[in-house]
């Protein structure tokens, strides 16, 4: 009787135990990462040939205490290696674990190698060679606390390497994990299986091998036991011959059929080649097809299982498309696959919620470093089953706001407006429309909110937005807003360089929805820009902290004699120049100046009739000589502005500080009058957020308007 150990992916241990018991294993004991079991030589070989779930099969050789590197050396040398492999064979050591004495796994592997080599040298005067690539013998050492376990790896390469897959798609599943997913899916042998995002076909191939009774190890040519001196070649030949016969009979007997599709033609060709090498090509129909074109291949029956490992995405910008994909998949399941089972394996349970289906069972497993979940669904025979509208209250509010705002925006002649602004506390986002595009901005949740719950709500919001606005996923841009500090205020988010031309009260304005946190157009200042256009006819106009120069455009189109646009950012000034040019505002009368606005203002001597200034609430940029706080410093700012303001002129001063208090007494002492016009500058789409900005008109004393 051999004491053996089968390793597997975390989360698959109980499944592996059941599989080993079905092969005849005895004394099975589950531990984290594998199963200890016992069996004779026949069972040893059968576990290697037939286990679909094991990663490796190990034959323990010795276990001993390690309190120093000498203990490790002596414990390994105590094994009679000459009874395990001969001097002409190569070997390699795989060492995992550390303790206080062996702090580096590479050092541990080196000590083990030395012990094995010295063992041979003392007995034979010769030493075996070490081979890092495909060694004849692989020695596995696991060190945990003060105990080392030494084993012979009978597998050689990992058992997931069945021998049928040369190439894979971008994110392949290991074959033993794929077999586990199939085993847990609820699929019944003899029924059809569909994978609408099959990639290189691993799930379908593993299922077809199960259906046709094909041993997963049948195609492997190299094993860790080939050079083992106790290898029973005759028994192995008997078992592989039996497996060949079973595979041949199973292929003829199975009634299961498999259907796979993917939108990548190259990957489908790889899947076909893999299926041919696995010996199951005649059971699987592969085709190039987008998941949106998915149809039931057997609409008249029998019922089967849809199984897949859909993409889950790592980048924020990919999430709207993935949410739309899962929502579409859920609708397809309900409309075309009534009575079937659905089983999806994903690293994102939040995306699975976008199916709008209720899972009957779920399992956890690791896919490499990723924590994953497999959810099984029973699809109702009748069409239209639903788990209810996702984020129904958010969706209803969105519909209500749209009914009110769409007509208003059309009448006003604006393409860009806010549809939703954190109206409901649990959905803390802003939704802005830019023509046929939508930007969803998530306000970063407080640290007290569970991150997974916040992510789930965001996914629900995106899903509902796509549905309510009937929007293609590639027209939704997702951003996360949080307090910007230092260089992050101006840092690029992406490098797409995609600009869209929008219209606002007759002005054409360029926006960029993807590359920066802001889009180039502050929607809440829309009416202020219109007022500036009306105030500027025949006047010299100054725009400070100008951003992308949108106020300068309105002033120019309103008939300003000249416009001067000042900002510290070259990027934004180039953007402002584009905005002016597309509106025909070119020539020397439209100046663009790159400068620290506070320094330029403090040192300036030119005079202007209309000045617009929208400073940051706080700034400490390295390119500014000192920090700026709008509440603390606004009076000093007004002193400089007054010097540049012609008699009869007007300053429009706006800022975004909540609770801002204008120093009226200080202004009076400076010889300035102030009139708050915040209410007049707030439009219908910001009616719920009265504190988004405050706005003032200032004039020389005695010139009230």
From Swiss-Prot:
Pfam families: Methyltrans_SAM, RlmL_1st, THUMP, UPF0020. One of its GO terms (molecular function) is RNA binding. CDD domains: AdoMet_MTases, THUMP_AdoMetMT. Its EC number is 2.1.1.173, 2.1.1.264. It is found in: Cytoplasm. Belongs to the methyltransferase superfamily. RlmKL family. Specifically methylates the guanine in position 2445 (m2G2445) and the guanine in position 2069 (m7G2069) of 23S rRNA. This is Ribosomal RNA large subunit methyltransferase K/L. It comes from Pectobacterium atrosepticum (strain SCRI 1043 / ATCC BAA-672). The gene is rlmL.
